[in-house]
Design a protein with these regions (language model features):
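Canonical Radical SAM [4Fe-4S] cluster-binding loop centered on the CxxxCxxC motif
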Residues: 5-49
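Conserved, mostly hydrophobic/aromatic
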Residues: 26, 34, 50, 69, ...
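Active-site mouth loops of central-metabolism enzymes
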Residues: 41-44, 102-109, 174-181
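Short, acidic/polar
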Residues: 50-51, 110-118, 180-188
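Conserved C-terminal portion of the radical SAM core fold
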Residues: 126, 149-211
Length: 214
């Protein structure tokens, strides 16, 4: 039905929901531990192409209530672009209750509270967010592009607008040497923010990522 651009990733919780690729790849794509989008160049898909896919899916699944916007960090899209998409989705799926996507600290902090509130009012009510670690030392080593304070600020900004957060931290990302640092500093982030769902991931590096990992 839909000609996806692979590889395609989605959170486990979105397994039974509609997935629509509004971007391809990841706008940052520099994390040393992540190989998910290394084969893709970041691209914003044309609205008319996305609309055609939404219309096709709506005809087949008119009772859809949940939609996940792929790829890596769709919140990188300008707010006006996202708002246009959200309004189109609401017209296509009259029973739509929730739209979700991956987001980073950079994405969130690039938007004002008013912009995020408007997106939330138009059904963007859940973001999936990779904290990875709270350690500034490890964040720098894995080239995450943000520090602990950025993570705390972005999570609290999103939470203040009513957007729910499903966050993940990575077990083992500090290795043996930085294990305590990883635990203690990550706990600081969790205690300083309002995360609705928290999960852990086990560190696993593909061969191409091992060469660049600290």
């Amino acid at each position: 039905m839909i000609d996806y651009d692979y590889p395609l990733f989605r959170p486990p919780a979105e397994a039974n929901n509609i997935i629509i690729q509004v971007t391809l790849g990841c706008s940052y794509n520099n994390c040393s531990f992540c190989s998910m989008y290394k084969t893709k160049k970041y691209e914003v898909r044309k609205l008319e192409d996305v609309y055609k896919e939404i219309d096709t899916i709506a005809r087949a699944y008119p009772a859809t209530t949940k939609v996940f916007l792929a790829d890596g960090d769709a919140l990188a899209l300008p707010s006006e672009h996202l708002l246009t998409l959200l309004k189109y989705l609401q017209k296509a799926f009259v029973k739509l209750r929730r739209v979700s996507l991956y987001a980073s600290a950079q994405n969130i902090l690039s938007k004002s509270q008013e912009e995020l509130e408007l997106l939330q009012k138009n059904r963007l009510t859940l973001i999936y967010y990779g904290i990875e670690t709270g350690s500034n030392l490890i964040l720098k080593k894995i080239t995450k592009g943000v520090g602990q304070s950025d993570i705390i600020e972005s999570l609290n900004l999103a939470s203040s607008t009513g957007i729910k957060i499903s966050a993940t931290v990575i077990l083992g990302i500090g290795g043996e040497l930085y294990s305590n640092e990883h635990i203690e500093q990550t706990a600081k982030i969790i205690n300083a923010t309002r995360v609705n769902y928290l999960s852990t991931l086990q560190l696993g590096l593909e061969e191409d990522a091992k060469d660049n990992f600290y």
